[in-house]
Regions:
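Active-site beta->alpha N-cap acidic-glycine motif
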Residues: 1-15, 27-28, 63, 75
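Histidine-centered divalent metal-coordination motifs
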Residues: 22, 26
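C-terminal active-site subregion of NodB/CE4 polysaccharide deacetylases
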Residues: 30-182
């Protein structure tokens, strides 16, 4: 399967596609808003996930400098990344230079740093389409500058569309048994 996946990735690249990292485990990589626990996951899980992506995915699809934050959860607030942000430093050390979060509060924004570009993206999925379609306040519609969601949303789709990030995403994984523990 890995060999076939690598061939597919190469075909996509040959056709002009840019591939990106969306992490290995789709974890909340970034800030939590809790002053006692500023990040959603531990540093160890952050480093492990980043390394697993490099070892398990990058080896198949080739190098990329684009990082699309899982769940849109950025590693910093709106202020520019700094050398003190060790998560940014680690991602940069892995070759990432373009960072994309999810921020539907504005049509778009871009931040250019000394050696990175950071931008918001809008998620165009079934959940966002549904939310935009049922929103009655025109000022709160997030996609109306692109299209009328009610013209795209399939009326045969079950509604309401709900979203859950799941219960296990930020839990500490079970400890692995090593040979020395057996």
């Amino acid at each position: 399967e890995r060999e076939q996946a690598a061939k597919v990735a190469q075909c996509l690249r040959d056709d002009g596609w840019e591939l990106a990292s969306h992490s290995w485990g789709h974890l909340w990589m970034g800030v939590s808003g809790d002053p006692q626990n500023p990040y959603k996951i531990s540093d160890e899980r952050f480093y492990t996930d980043t390394d697993k992506w490099a070892n398990e995915v990058e080896t198949l699809i080739g190098p990329t400098d684009i990082y699309i934050y899982p769940n849109g959860n950025d590693i910093a607030d709106w202020h520019p990344y700094t050398d003190e942000n060790y998560r940014y430093q680690y991602l940069a050390s892995k070759g990432f230079r373009y960072f994309c979060n999810v921020d539907a509060s504005k049509p778009s924004w871009i931040q250019m740093g000394h050696d990175y570009l950071r931008m918001a993206r809008r998620n165009l999925d079934g959940y966002r389409l549904y939310e935009d379609m049922i929103q009655e306040d025109p000022a709160k519609k997030r996609l109306s500058d692109l299209f009328d969601s009610s013209q795209i949303f399939d009326p045969s789709r079950p509604t309401p569309v709900t979203w859950s990030y799941g219960q296990t995403q930020n839990e500490t994984p079970a400890e692995e048994t090593t040979a020395s523990q057996q």
